[in-house]
């Protein structure tokens, strides 16, 4: 094999890795050894299902199960015309380093972009909740949703829009720690979505947290306070 042919085959392989696209739900098994697994191809879910399901070994923690979404990769939950759009990424007990774009699927109610519990999320690019399409009574999806989550945000997290209903929250759940150096915004709608909505929250904000726009603007921060 001559040199020019070897270079041509190498470039073809690289372009295939970057540009190839999966359709339908994909499951990735993380290794639990603290070494990151990388997603280098875009993934789109179908029929309101998740795009990417995360599986982890038993008796491991989120610091040992690491997933990286690489630059120029798009992960989007499946669209549903009658129900909730699918999550972009769903899982429990893992770390997500996002350098691409993650979207919840559009639906009667928009899907959540990243959904699960016991997650550390480092967001270096964009996370979008899915758009709600159902009209009155429907809602956009949250950018991030779950319990026991740590969010390090350096770029943008958006709740999904719903022109006839309520915008989704940027981040929602309980027992959530947020370090924000970028923007966290609720989705737009008849009622604007909250920037952050939940209970037992610890927030350090160095940039912007904003509710979405609507006839009634969403709250920058909505807290549920329970008496002890």
Regions found by a protein language model. Name each.
Residues 17-27:
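Boundary at the C-terminal end of the N-terminal hydrophobic targeting segment
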């Amino acid at each position: 094999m001559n040199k020019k042919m070897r270079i041509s085959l190498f470039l073809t392989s690289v372009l295939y890795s970057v540009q190839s696209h999966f359709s339908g739900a994909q499951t990735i098994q993380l290794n639990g050894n603290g070494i990151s697994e990388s997603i280098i191809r875009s993934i789109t879910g179908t029929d309101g299902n998740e795009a990417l399901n995360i599986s982890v070994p038993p008796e491991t923690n989120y610091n040992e199960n690491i997933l990286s979404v690489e630059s120029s990769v798009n992960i989007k939950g499946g669209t549903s015309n009658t129900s909730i759009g699918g999550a972009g990424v769903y899982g429990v007990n893992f770390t997500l380093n996002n350098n691409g774009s993650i979207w919840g699927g559009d639906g009667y109610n928009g899907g959540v972009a990243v959904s699960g519990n016991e997650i550390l999320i480092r967001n270096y690019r964009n996370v979008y909740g899915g758009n709600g399409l159902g009209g009155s009574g429907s809602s956009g999806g949250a950018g991030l949703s779950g319990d026991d989550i740590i969010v390090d945000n350096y770029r943008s997290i958006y709740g999904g829009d719903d022109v006839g209903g309520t915008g989704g929250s940027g981040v929602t759940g309980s027992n959530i720690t947020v370090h924000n150096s970028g923007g966290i915004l609720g989705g737009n709608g008849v009622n604007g979505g909250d920037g952050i909505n939940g209970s037992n929250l610890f927030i350090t904000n160095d940039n912007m947290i904003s509710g979405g726009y609507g006839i009634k603007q969403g709250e920058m921060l909505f807290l549920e306070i329970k008496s002890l």
